[in-house]
């Protein structure tokens, strides 16, 4: 070790640099300019990119791919690109929204998806009430008095029906299917120069009311398909027909001189017809646009109508007065249907949403909608089951879906047609517990199953009429014969006939070769 006296002396240098706490804050982000005093293109591009990233980070983009697709469709952009993943699609939407924000001169991402949709939903969900008159109060009380005894009668039969062994039910339904599978084309008749738009079979099964695009309503005999009567009154397309409950049935004492049939037209008029004159007995006026469907209440005292003016209305048949104007749809209402009790009404239309209304209180008790459950295109048809708590909806998306108001959810769905579903009818036969004579018991005292409610029929723009089982939702029969889209379909209560009409201007009659029903 070297002695300190021998070590070389080195003078300490003065401290160099600056302490961290003494470093000044620099808020000047200007990039130094070139010799000409103009920022370089590269520096400008970097600044623009940083600003765009900062703006993009402030824009809220949904994580749900369905909402991402919907927003892209709304902006007129391709919903999906070849090989594009979910994350890529979301990033593409963010980029488009960023560009839109830049064009609008927004710096803080004011056009957020969440804010815009929340505002829209608040507008749509805003609830308001309209005071009803004494006629509406009377109508609601009448429906309470009418529906409660019917509901009691229906549930009593359902309790008895629940005792039927499953094995017996399966065997009985199999027999019904076998008889339906034997249905064939039995007749065809051209009934006008324009497309057939609506067909409805009379309660006695001996006539069918036919409406066409020319505004004509005709009565055609079954099974001959000869024209019996031509009603004159409409000036535009017939889009709704409904028979008065019990009309043409001798035991119901409905006179041919009184109201037997109702029709709705594209000119906005509703006409009530007797069977003894070719001009309307009376007309119901109030809709400002096309009347899409009409249907009598099971009591026959009221008539419901659906219209393109986004409302459905309830009319008093005796006084021809408008009892209720009900809003609730954002677009035209295309279909209405009463349940068998007469307490509920289903409505649906071009907004792809259905609603179940309690006629006794005026409240909506169920909405036929949902991300996975609802329809993605307009709903064209509605019909209730004879059990009173299930309703079918048919849509332009080709699907028929079943909704249970007790569970408040969808309970079944069928990809019924390759094109739009135009019409649909759930079979209610002569053995229906409310509209007919329910089946009794066998020799051992066991309850017999009923045919009513065992199947339903549908028509579509794929030129077919189809028959489906209503328990396992399987296809029973496809009736092909129309050369154009089929616009309407109906059945006879005795199960002998199915009638359809379409754009080929014909009415076609389907049945078994032996002339027997199901």
Model-inferred region functions:
Residues 341-343, 351-409, 420, 431-435, ...:
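Hydrophobic, structured segments
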Residues 1-194:
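Intrinsically disordered terminal extensions that flank WD40 beta-propeller domains
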Residues 276, 318, 360, 406, ...:
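Adenine-nucleotide cofactor-binding loop residues
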Residues 4, 514-518:
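A positional/structural detector of protein chain ends, strongest at the extreme C-terminus
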Residues 161-328, 335-337, 367-374, 383, ...:
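WD40 beta-propeller repeat fold
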Residues 495:
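Conserved "HGTGT" condensation-loop signature of ketosynthase/thiolase-family condensing enzymes
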